């Protein structure tokens, strides 16, 4: 068993375990009941046990010390709940050891998304919109890990882009996971040695570093380049009138530019490019700036002003109209009875 304490690896001897061989045990019970068991008498059957030997030999684990890939992203603009979710997801992955041929599922490692598992409500993408959900921000964890895995050149078997663009990595460099859509980020340790995943957060930055045994040539370097193939800029604002809310209530969601992008893997030897390979292609939805605007008022004229402002499809015009209506109402409230006559 491999652990990392204060920047140094420590190896703990594994212990042999035993697991019940369910199929063989069921057969043994059936054979006893249909064979030697005498009806009405007590009896017992020994379950069939299988030996579960610990993985990893000490001499193999002792070789794990080289940085195969590392990557850092920032969540400096995130609120407290999203920041907690990023740190929590990171801690659930930190300390993972994968032996040659092992498969790692990010979703299975960080689930369930519940308060009991350390998550809180925060913003996330769902069907091209920003919504609050338990575990919002977990995709920054999977994305950061994805980029470390790419630099370690491990085998990626499943990766999905977000429905809309994210800001913490370049287009096509993201890896979304989602319970609702079944998205996962999965990779395989395709090296001949164990690898260790170190993850930590500090100063609102998350870093994953993958350690193993470096077998790649020293004069060889790997880099990744994002290419935007198509860009779709939102045009008119989308404004929804809400008759259940009073004038002055407005909820605005930011616009998202739509992209088609590709990610390229570039290999250089002695500083000279020797190969360029497409890693993935990604499509991100365009989403206009949207607003839900309250129009309810005892003053029909104020409601009419709001409806006219909404018809312009300009959130800025709507905000200006709200300010004008409030100013009119304040001025009217300040009038004396004599002035109203």
Positions of the model-derived regions?
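Well-ordered beta-sheet/strand-loop patches within structured domains
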Residues: 1-341
């Amino acid at each position: 068993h491999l652990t990392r304490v204060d920047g140094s690896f420590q190896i703990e001897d594994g212990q042999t375990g035993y697991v019940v061989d369910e199929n063989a045990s069921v057969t043994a019970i059936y054979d006893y009941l249909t064979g030697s068991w005498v009806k009405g008498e007590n009896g017992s059957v020994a379950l069939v046990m299988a030996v579960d030997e610990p993985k990893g030999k000490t001499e193999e684990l002792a070789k794990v010390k080289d940085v195969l890939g590392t990557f850092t992203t920032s969540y400096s603009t995130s609120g407290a709940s999203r920041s907690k979710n990023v740190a929590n997801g990171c801690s659930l992955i930190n300390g993972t050891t994968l032996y040659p041929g092992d498969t790692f599922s990010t979703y299975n490692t960080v689930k369930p998304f519940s308060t009991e598992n350390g998550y809180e409500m925060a913003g996330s993408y769902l069907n091209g919109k920003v919504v609050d959900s338990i575990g919002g921000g977990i995709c920054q964890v999977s994305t950061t890990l994805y980029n470390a895995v790419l630099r370690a050149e491990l085998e990626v078997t499943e990766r999905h882009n977000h429905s809309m663009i994210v800001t913490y990595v370049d287009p096509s460099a993201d890896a979304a996971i989602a319970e609702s859509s079944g998205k996962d980020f999965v990779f395989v340790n395709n090296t001949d040695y164990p690898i260790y995943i170190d993850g930590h957060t500090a100063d609102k930055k998350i870093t994953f570093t993958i350690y193993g045994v470096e077998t790649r040539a020293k004069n060889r370097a790997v880099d990744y380049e994002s290419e935007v193939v198509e860009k779709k800029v939102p045009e008119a604002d989308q404004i929804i009138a809400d008759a259940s809310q009073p004038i002055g209530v407005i909820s605005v969601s930011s616009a998202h530019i739509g992209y088609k992008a590709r990610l390229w893997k570039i290999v250089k030897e002695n500083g000279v490019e020797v190969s360029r390979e497409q890693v993935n292609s990604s499509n991100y939805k365009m989403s206009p700036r949207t607003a839900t605007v309250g129009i309810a008022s005892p003053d029909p004229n104020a409601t009419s002003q709001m409806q006219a402002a909404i018809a312009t499809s300009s959130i800025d015009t709507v905000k200006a109209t709200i300010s004008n209506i409030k100013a009119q109402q304040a001025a009217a409230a300040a009038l004396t009875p004599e002035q109203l006559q």
